[in-house]
């Protein structure tokens, strides 16, 4: 076990406001060759929150962890994933 591994409580409310989401998207761009910006250019009607969700889904973050980050239920996150997939597929 890694004593430095984040605990579930460390994720709670991590992405609960737009300011935190903007910082996250800037970090995604920095680490992943402008992934978030490219996604927003490809699908301009994505909100900041939707773009953050897409980035987390792309990173294969567990649904339960994303739920903690946004202070939402796992079923809400699963529904959001399906709606975003439909929105993205409609643009392609």
Mark where each language-model region is.
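N-terminal regulatory/sensing modules of transcriptional regulators
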Residues: 1-18
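Cytosolic nucleotide-binding catalytic cores of signal-transduction proteins
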Residues: 18-92
């Amino acid at each position: 076990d890694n004593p430095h591994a984040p605990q579930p409580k460390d994720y709670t409310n991590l992405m609960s406001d737009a300011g935190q989401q903007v910082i996250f998207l800037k970090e995604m761009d920095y680490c992943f060759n402008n992934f978030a910006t490219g996604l927003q250019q490809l699908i301009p009607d994505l909100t900041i929150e939707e773009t953050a969700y897409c980035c987390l889904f792309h990173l294969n973050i567990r649904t339960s962890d994303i739920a903690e980050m946004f202070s939402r239920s796992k079923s809400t996150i699963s529904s959001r994933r399906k709606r975003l997939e439909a929105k993205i597929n409609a643009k392609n």
